[in-house]
Amino acid sequence: DAGGTTAQASIALIQQVWPYVTDEVAAQILAGTAFTDFAGFDPDVHGLGVIDIDQALLPIGELRMPLDGREGTRAINGEIAGVNFGSFDNVTAVDSAGRGFDININSMHTPDIQNNWYDVALTDSITRMDYNFDYVYSEGMLNYSPTDESGNFTMGLRDIKLAKGWYLQGQYTTLADRNPWFHMSGMWGTINSSETIETVVTHVKDKFMFNMGNMHTTTNFDSGLVTNVTPIDSVWGEISWRNEGLRLAVGSMPYVVKGDIDVRLPSTIDSQGIVHHDTFNFEIENQFATYSSVNYANSFRNINYTLGAYNNTLGFYQAQVKLNLAF
């Protein structure tokens, strides 16, 4: 149908759903859906034309995430991983006409993140942050990796003697553009770098070695929906037995015990069209897992070789063979 009465009723329906939409904006929305390509169309007679009210109740243009008040919007894109949102899924977005719509962001967040520590048991290093680097050098008590092209860097001291059979290791690590515990992009925010201070207490007795480590990670980031990231604390432990070239080990992979983020999300739009946000707190978490490994190193004539195998309770298995030919 067409005409003034139908148009006014349609405007009233739009304003019933979105009270803050003005008559002018509502008329523009309806005009965008009106069908006028029919014989004899006369705006003085038919008004806006044949209105598709169902179409008028759908979003116009791209849905975007509103900022505080009516100060602007941001594109709905990106993801966040390593954070447990629980059952939280719906937020408010706005279309190009400024109308609010509930959207589901379930596909844009996940508590799972690729584990950074799978290769931990296939090396002989004591500190765990080493496993974010391809090469780490040890010279005396110094443990380090030169700054790479991305700006990643690690350096620390090892084998600081505390008492008979007890040692302390300390490591400082900078990772560019990432945090080892969670990831975010797009509307959530951007991680510029993370800094981790790791301390490890080691006890050696006969052929056994016990390591207990703690990592304290801070995050430098540009905020988006994420407005705050607290320091992240994680712990790990390992016990190993070595006899000449054979090394057996069991342990726990680094596990987050403390750390969370604040996320400011649009929740409602009031009758004046003002967007209201709520701040939610979500925990950074990973799955607790244990591992076991075996490594054997020996030589035959002028060939040095190493055999290694590793598995963890996350279902990951790995084996490797290294051969070095000495001339």
Question: Locations of the language-model features?
Answer:
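A short, acidic, flexible beta-alpha connecting loop/helix-capping segment that sits on the rim
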Residues: G308-L314
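Substrate-binding/access-modulating region of protease and related hydrolase catalytic domains
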Residues: A2-T6, V45, W181
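C-terminal subdomain of the subtilisin-like protease fold in secreted/lumenal serine endopeptidases
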Residues: Q16-P111, N115
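Extracellular S/T/G-rich loop segment that most often corresponds to the catalytic His/Ser-adjacent loop
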Residues: D1-A12, Q16, Y20
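Outer membrane beta-barrel translocator domains of Type V secretion systems
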Residues: A97, N104-H216
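Outer-membrane beta-barrel "beta-signal"
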Residues: N243-G245, N298, G315-F327
